[in-house]
Swiss-Prot record:
One of its GO terms (cellular component) is chloroplast thylakoid. Keywords: Chloroplast, Plastid, Thylakoid. It comes from Pisum sativum (Garden pea). On the 2D-gel the determined pI of this protein is: 6.0, its MW is: 22.9 kDa. This is Unknown protein from spot 112 of 2D-PAGE of thylakoid. It is found in: Plastid, Chloroplast thylakoid.
Length: 14
């Protein structure tokens, strides 16, 4: 969950 990565969906919940 790194900001700007494709994994950012984990941070945003989207």
């Amino acid at each position: 969950a790194t900001k700007g990565s494709s994994d950012n969906r984990v941070l945003t919940g989207v």
